[in-house]
A protein has these predicted regions:
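Intrinsically disordered, low-complexity, basic-enriched segments
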Residues: 8-10, 21, 36-37, 50, ...
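Methionine residue identity
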Residues: 84-87
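N-terminal acidic leader/helix
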Residues: 2-33
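Amphipathic, hydrophobic secondary-structure cores in small proteins
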Residues: 32-56
């Protein structure tokens, strides 16, 4: 039986990194934390980002990031928490 990872090419890997890093920037958290959310808390990386590469990579960055964050929320990842903390930090700095 072929392992799913056998068909990951450099395009898919580069796209996965692009998604992880841009989600991290939007949520103001580390790429490592986002990777854990997409692989350990959910399986979004292997079940959505990689298999849907052909469609997703044609969209703009904001659409991709917001789409994945919305899916993370649907899967129970507490993304809103990171957004709230960032907003509170910004309020205190202004």
């Amino acid at each position: 039986m072929e392992n799913k990872k056998d068909w990951y090419g450099s395009k898919e890997l580069e796209f996965a990194i692009f998604c992880i890093e841009n989600i991290a920037i939007k949520l103001n958290i580390s790429g490592q934390d986002v990777y854990k959310m997409l692989t350990e808390e959910t399986n979004i990386l292997n079940d959505y980002i990689i298999p849907c590469y052909e469609v997703l990579h044609t969209q703009d960055k904001n659409y991709i990031v917001n789409d994945i964050i919305e899916l993370m929320n649907e899967k129970g990842v507490k993304v809103w928490f990171y957004t709230m903390v960032l907003m509170l930090l910004l309020i205190n700095l202004i």
